[in-house]
Regions:
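N-terminal segments that cap or nucleate solenoid repeat domains
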Residues: 30-70, 79, 323, 327, ...
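Ankyrin repeat domain, specifically the short helix-to-loop turn at the C-terminus of the second helix
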Residues: 51-56, 81-89, 114-122, 147-155, ...
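Ankyrin repeat A-helix N-terminal signature
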Residues: 37-41, 70-76, 103-109, 136-142, ...
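Bacterial N-terminal signal peptides
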Residues: 15-25
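Start-of-repeat signature of ankyrin repeats
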Residues: 64, 97, 130, 163-164, ...
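Conserved ankyrin/ankyrin-like repeat signature
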Residues: 46, 78-79, 111-112, 144-145, ...
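Terminal, low-structured helical/coil segments at or just beyond the last alpha-helical repeat
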Residues: 584-641
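Ankyrin repeat boundary signal
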Residues: 59-60, 90-93, 124-126, 156-160, ...
């Protein structure tokens, strides 16, 4: 009995003690969380009450936020001073790495910044990605906040680690002229550049292959070898057509083995002489699985040869932006003026060759561009893509639905283009790379390499601009490097439905008439074999078709084949008439093959009138293959002729 009562009392006492401890723990935990909660609401009275009860002033919420961080975030300098006096740690960060000084600097809050610095915060503390408080304050534009940090020894030329930008670049990007002046007076380097980086590359395609006809033949070999049981005899036929008799001693089976292991990409368009990838006709090494692959003559490389070979590392070709480039990009003339007065070079370029003038033009900041020209900017300074202010201005005026948004210009585009021409812009300059507004859609069948501003204007049917360029000496007979004429571009070569900008269908017709009047040959074949009529037929521009045929355009001209028509090796190398494009049989790049019945009808009528036998209506790729082209040894390209 006694033992039972004693045991019961001990059990009761333990339950009471546990309840008291749990209550105390809950009370303490609540108080620790509550001080940051109170600060988040700006409840100073509650904070003072909690501090008197002994609450931990540095207690953190679930995300690491403290009361001092909330005071900085809310811009409450008085509360920040109270918390600092109570022992708040000014360098304590939340789980994202944000400190009270980081939050205050981002807001440009000079009063809170001073309170934190007085309380022991480090003006040069390292934030995530190497950012410094001065960079954030400079970006905010608050001059007093920048003063406060500089007065406490902030490094004016420190750079963050992600892109290598400095406080000067941050201020320039936001157009804060007064902050720029203050930073320069404290020794900011106006010539400093951000970190070099790699630019995004472009995928090679038939439109920019060095030899489109060989690219088509390579595609045929790839399709043959990709079959479950490759027809090695047909592979031999196609290889001899491509490489001649020199390929006779090679193993077709080994070649196909490499293609099967690597996929169709093993035989790439670039293998025909382009800059990307490798394959039949390109420099390659051993396959990852040990299969032999091909050398530059189409001969297999023995297993083990070239093991461990790696292409040389590419040097960064992007980045290295200066503060003046940032200012030009943002369009702040006041910021640019301060930087130039501080010694910035108006023609200093980025790693890819972007000058401040190019950056301003690319972003449609034409008032800024004019200001830079007035201060010595070279109007013909091109970047590594060969893009000049004139070409970019023409491109902006006729912008496509591209990969990059384009701002609304702050000056009439034709006024700016005229200004550039009057200042000596080279009207016949040829670019060397497709511009950034060129999408993967258009880049795959119209490469801008070698294009002039005139050709770019022609593509969009900008008749008014074409006449202006001619008046300033434009040569209408300069083609792209792969032989696309301004007439072909205007007619539809490179056209992508829903992407390519056109002034209007009517203006395009007038543009085609104008280009013909300048003496451009409508039957000039590009390296792909296409003529202007192929483009008009693919686009479904019926009236343009009529104009071209009336001007002597031939309807029996075949292209040199198309890597985008697959399904059989012979379809891959089949050559196509303009009527085939109108019938929706030819896919170009990622642009769908769209039938245009009205254009097809008109072309058939015109073919009959010219004594040509038009193909039957209602054709499909499947029916075409059955009755016409899918035969062993079929060679419409005549690559060795």
């Amino acid at each position: 009995m006694t033992g039972s009562v004693g045991s019961s009392m001990r059990s009761f006492a333990l339950r009471i003690l546990s309840a008291v401890l749990l209550s105390a723990m809950a009370s303490t935990s609540f108080a620790q969380a509550d001080i940051a909660d109170a600060a988040s609401k700006g409840n100073r009275a509650e904070i003072e009450r909690l501090l008197k009860r002994g609450a931990d002033v540095n207690a953190q919420q679930a995300d690491g936020a403290t009361a001092l961080q909330w005071a900085a975030y809310r811009g409450d300098a008085g509360l920040a001073e109270l918390l600092l006096k109570a022992g708040a740690k000014p360098g304590l960060a939340n789980h994202d790495g944000a400190t009270p000084l980081w939050l205050a600097a981002a807001r440009g809050d000079a009063a809170v910044i001073r309170a934190l610095l007085k309380g022991g915060a480090d003006a040069n503390e390292q934030l995530p990605l190497g950012r410094r408080p001065l960079m954030l304050a400079a970006r905010s534009g608050n001059l007093d906040a920048v003063h406060a940090l500089l007065d406490h020894g902030a490094d004016v030329n420190a750079s963050e680690t992600e892109r290598g930008t400095t406080a000067l670049m941050q201020a320039a990007d936001q157009g804060h002229a007064e902050v720029l002046m203050e930073l320069i007076q404290h020794g900011a380097n106006v010539a400093a550049a951000s970190r070099p980086v790699m630019r995004d590359g472009r995928t090679a395609a038939l439109g920019n292959s060095e030899d489109p006809r060989r690219a088509v033949r390579q595609q045929a070999i790839a399709v043959l070898c990709d079959a479950k049981t490759p027809d090695l005899r047909e592979v031999r036929i196609q290889r001899e057509m491509l490489f001649g008799a020199s390929a006779k001693s090679t193993s077709d089976a080994d070649l196909c083995k490499g293609i099967q292991r690597r996929g169709l990409g093993f035989v790439t368009v670039a293998g025909a002489g382009g800059n990307h990838g490798a394959g039949v006709g390109g420099e390659v090494t051993e396959d990852a699985d040990g299969a032999a692959v091909a050398d530059a003559s189409g001969n297999p490389v023995p297993v083990g040869a070239g093991r461990g070979h790696r292409p040389p590392a590419r040097e960064p070709d992007g980045g290295a932006l200066t503060a003046l480039v940032y200012a030009a990009r943002s369009g702040s003339i006041d910021a640019a003026r301060v930087l130039l007065e501080g010694g910035a070079d108006v023609n200093q370029t980025t790693r890819y060759g972007w000058s401040p003038l190019l950056a301003a033009t690319h972003n449609s900041n034409y008032q800024m561009a004019r200001f830079l020209i007035e201060h010595g900017a070279d109007v013909n300074l091109a970047n590594k893509g060969g893009w000049t202010p004139l070409y970019l201005a023409v491109d902006n005026r006729n912008i496509e639905g591209g990969d990059y948004p384009v701002r609304t210009a702050d000056m009439d585009s034709l006024t700016y283009i005229t200004y550039l021409l009057d200042k000596g812009a080279n009207v016949n300059w040829r670019i060397t790379e497709s511009t950034e507004t060129r999408t993967v859609f258009t880049n795959q069948w119209l490469n801008e390499d070698g294009a002039t501003a005139f050709l770019r204007a022609a593509q969009s049917g900008d008749l008014e601009l074409l006449k202006l360029l001619v008046a300033h000496g434009a040569d209408p007979k300069i083609n792209t490097r792969l032989g696309v004429t301004p007439l072909a571009a205007a007619a539809g070569i490179g056209w992508v439905e829903g992407v390519t900008q056109e002034r209007s269908p009517g203006e395009t017709v007038e543009t085609v008439k104008y280009l013909l009047s300048l003496g451009i040959n409508p039957n000039f074949q590009a390296d792909t074999g296409r003529v202007a009529l192929h483009g008009a037929a693919h686009k479904g521009a019926t009236e343009v078709v009529r104009v071209l045929v009336a001007a002597g355009a031939r309807m029996d001209v075949r292209d040199f084949g198309n890597t985008d028509n697959r399904g059989s090796p012979t379809l891959a190398i089949h050559t196509w008439l303009p009527i085939d494009y109108a019938d929706g049989l030819v896919r170009v790049g990622v642009q769908s093959a769209i039938p245009h019945p009205e254009t097809s009808r008109v072309l058939r009528e015109l073919m009959l009138k010219a004594g040509l036998k038009p193909p039957p209506e209602g054709r499909t790729l499947e029916s075409l293959c059955i009755v016409d082209v899918c035969k062993p040894g079929y060679d419409p390209i005549g690559i060795n002729n």
